[in-house]
């Protein structure tokens, strides 16, 4: 299935049906009085997060969603039928953004979460509603309220606990394949990964989700390479794993390139907890590993893990470090949502 994480959608709620002007006409009843029914309500447009979807590709082939209008009222106090609602089924993690591309209307992060995008118009009143002590036979009724036209953007941000960052060919997909059941495309050329991949990782009886996004290059924030369009998919992550190719002769420059792109992207991404790992040590001798690790630790100001995705060396240590950050972040969220007790 093709991956699509941004699309424009046009929606319209249904208008309300008009009220009915009608009078009761029966044999032997001279003054039957008004009996016009109300119009039906128009259908509303909703969005709902559902399980089993991980792309917005369906909205490429259908961008217009118009709910049906309510039926007009009828005589004998019969109310018109209401229009059916329309529900846009989107993946969990979808942001709904207004036409200005800035205002976030809703962020659907849980299965079953719903948001009303356009309310259907109310049905008009029939003439029965206007009967009074001074007007026994009203000949007026209300038209239904019109529906609402709206243009919105749907933007998918994958929900993962940890995000993989690095230059192209840093070994991100190999790491994901070695630590999870995910099977991303792996090859020895840049930009093998063209779309984000998710993998469920297990460590010490715990599970969490890792997102692998296409590699960044210098100038990605300005649109070079695949650009920074996929960085949105790691915005929700609790921790970032920065993989650096240990066989590169410019290992410190490679590290700083990614950090520079994170800072250029803006938001809180550059402030997220980061774990740095030097990959591909299976292709290095012990002296190279020691020298380049030392240089990288000097640049990062912290610990640098040494791993090999191909040989499986050092992977569990990195996974445990990731889990420690994720577990801490989950604990903080529980405290934030805990009800206050005296």
Swiss-Prot record:
Presence of the UniProt keyword Hydrolase in the record: yes
Domain Obg: 1-159
GO molecular function: GTP binding; GTPase activity; magnesium ion binding
Keyword hit for Ligase: no
Compartment list: Cytoplasm
Pfam families listed in its UniProt record: GTP1_OBG, MMR_HSR1
GO biological process, one term: ribosome biogenesis
EC number(s) on file: 3.6.5.-
GO CC entries: cytoplasm
SUPFAM superfamilies: Obg GTP-binding protein N-terminal domain, P-loop containing nucleoside triphosphate hydrolases
Record-annotated OBG-type G domain positions: 160-327
Binding site for Mg(2+): 173, 193
Cofactor: Mg(2+)
Amino acids binding GTP: 166-173, 191-195, 212-215, 279-282, 308-310
Principal location class: cytoplasm
Gene3D superfamilies recorded: GTP1/OBG domain (2.70.210.12), P-loop containing nucleotide triphosphate hydrolases (3.40.50.300)
Keywords (A to Z) from UniProt: Cytoplasm, GTP-binding, Hydrolase, Magnesium, Metal-binding, Nucleotide-binding
Family affiliation: Belongs to the TRAFAC class OBG-HflX-like GTPase superfamily. OBG GTPase family.
Alphabetized NCBIfam families for the sequence: Obg_CgtA, PRK12297.1, PRK12299.1
Subunit structure: Monomer.
Function: An essential GTPase which binds GTP, GDP and possibly (p)ppGpp with moderate affinity, with high nucleotide exchange rates and a fairly low GTP hydrolysis rate. Plays a role in control of the cell cycle, stress response, ribosome biogenesis and in those bacteria that undergo differentiation, in morphogenesis control.
Name of the protein described by the UniProt record: GTPase Obg
């Amino acid at each position: 299935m093709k991956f699509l994480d941004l699309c424009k959608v046009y929606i319209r709620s249904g208008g309300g049906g008009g009220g009915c002007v009608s009078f009761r006409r029966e044999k032997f009843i001279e003054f039957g009085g008004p009996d016009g029914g109300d119009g039906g309500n128009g259908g509303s447009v909703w969005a709902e997060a559902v399980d089993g979807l991980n792309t917005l590709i369906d909205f490429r082939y259908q961008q217009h969603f118009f709910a049906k209008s309510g039926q007009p009222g009828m005589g004998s106090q019969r109310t018109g039928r209401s229009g059916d609602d329309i529900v846009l089924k989107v993946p969990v993690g979808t942001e709904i953004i207004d036409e200005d591309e800035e205002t976030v209307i809703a962020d659907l992060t849980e299965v079953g979460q719903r948001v009303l995008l356009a309310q259907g118009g109310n049905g008009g009143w029939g003439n029965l509603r206007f009967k009074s002590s001074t007007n026994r036979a009203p000949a007026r009724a209300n038209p239904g309220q019109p529906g609402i036209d709206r243009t919105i953007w749907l933007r998918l941000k994958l929900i993962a606990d940890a995000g993989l960052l690095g230059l192209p060919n840093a070994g991100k997909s190999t790491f994901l394949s070695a630590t999870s059941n995910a099977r991303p495309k792996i090859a020895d050329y840049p930009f093998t990964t063209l779309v984000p991949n998710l993998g469920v990782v297990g460590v010490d009886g715990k599970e969490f989700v890792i997102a692998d996004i296409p590699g960044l290059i210098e100038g990605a924030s300005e649109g070079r390479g695949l650009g920074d369009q996929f960085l949105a998919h790691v915005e929700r992550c609790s921790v970032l794993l920065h993989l650096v190719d240990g066989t590169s002769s410019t290992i410190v420059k490679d590290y700083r390139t990614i950090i520079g792109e994170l800072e250029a992207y803006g938001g809180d991404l550059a402030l997220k907890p980061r774990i740095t790992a030097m990959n591909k040590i299976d292709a290095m001798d012990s002296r190279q590993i020691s020298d380049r690790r030392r240089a990288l630790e000097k640049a990062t100001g912290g610990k640098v893990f040494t791993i090999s995705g191909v040989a499986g060396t050092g992977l569990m240590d990195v996974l445990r470090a990731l889990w420690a950050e994720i577990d801490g972040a989950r604990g903080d969220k529980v405290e934030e949502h805990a009800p206050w007790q005296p």
